[in-house]
Amino acid sequence: SVVPLIPADFPYPVVLVQHMPKGFTGSLAARLNELSPLRVKEACDGEPLRPGTLYIAMGGKQCQLIQKRPGEYYISEKDAEARGGLKPCADIFYESLVNTSLDKIYSIVLTGMGSDATKGIQLLKQTKKVEVVAQDRESCVVYGMPRAAALAGIVDEMVPLTEITKTMLKRIGV
């Protein structure tokens, strides 16, 4: 409902942090790559980010974004500790964006237990322009993560799952 609707000519890289254990994100990436016009792959440590590619954070590792030079961003996948029992953890990924020169960041918060993503986005919003679209309560299997983000006041728009991609593409101007 989200990834397959992103067009093949999408001009930016996309990073998906999905709470999945080691060994499952590779098959998820392969399946989404079959269903999507966008290139989808499991993120690899040291890999440069490329426009038109969606990188799925590797299960069982912590994913961060590293900037080597202005405009050059790389994935870092490390065997760091779990945070809140999560590996990968969206908060850790968002926190890594603070130290980059990215000036505008778009985020989607989908169904999930707990409050992962909220603290990271709050921190990011202190120094960057961040737009957040979250899945609405009615279309969530578990309303935890979108609810936490909404209660923290960091969500710009809440929409049904079927409208997430269209809404974000409109916000980005694609």
Label every model-predicted segment.
Residues 1-174:
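Conserved acid/base catalytic micro-environments in cytosolic active-site loops
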